[in-house]
């Protein structure tokens, strides 16, 4: 091979090799996470890297004209197959296919790679490992969701974090849905509203960024424009006022919609159960947490660090949520035609390798 034809040793954007200490740390973290999954009663599940595209669903991407745009898909004879975007959709397919052989309350954990066909960044990869824990079946929902919160706390404490170093934020999607119903926001705008609210705590957004997304459009620092929900000034103002509420008591006094009140009551039930554990201090209400994926139906959880993280290059980075999830009522009904409730969480294992660097004091 002559000099002009030599290959350039490189990887596609959003993919990386992992070796040496970083890989050792990752494996150590996964042992801690898996130990806690087993302690909380789950059994392992492994599904193929590929699923039929229809199994993954059309509720993923923010591009409403092309909802599967964030999914890597390929034509395989007369079918479209996709690399799995998350571990929840394969779980729904597996449960629908095998539920007769599974216990009535099925707890499973899965630790596998997922793939996202989206813009990569320093802390955002297009292939990464997720570690999921889910509970499916007719279990008491407050009990199941409280168990998820306890599992998150137990795992993070075992990893080496202190209670004051992380916050488990919880909410209920019914709360904001009730407000949306009261404001008579049309169906075609509702998903954009929910995704706008979910951006509040993301870097570079804040109330102004959310307001732009609730109205005509938002232009970011690069000049890229995101289409807004095109709400009226009054509708946008009501939502922004809602986002300023921080506690259940005030929320209960201000939101009278029956669906909102139902969501508030469900959150109160979760806190009542958590009160019997030793983990209550780490768990807070945050009504701006709604999660962008359409399949979430009520309970929502998102866990964030209370300190800045330094990466291997010595640079402070925002790694975002380190564990998130929630309840879903219709994910399995796409296959079974019957609503089978489920709830679950996902740890992003790559994020935790930042935590265990010497600069962050956990090794």
Label for each model-derived stretch:
Residues 67-76, 185-206:
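Acidic, His- and aromatic-enriched active-site or binding-groove loops in soluble protein domains
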Residues 2-3, 22-41, 51-52, 78, ...:
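Positively charged, Gly/Ser-enriched RNA/tRNA-binding surfaces
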Residues 354-363:
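Single conserved hydrophobic/aromatic residue that forms the stacking wall/gate
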Residues 50, 169, 193:
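Residue-level "edge-of-site" marker
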Residues 45, 49-81, 124:
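Polyanion/phosphate-binding surface patch
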Residues 169-183, 198-205:
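Short, conserved secondary-structure transition motifs
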Residues 2-23:
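Auxiliary tRNA-acceptor-end handling modules of aminoacyl-tRNA synthetases
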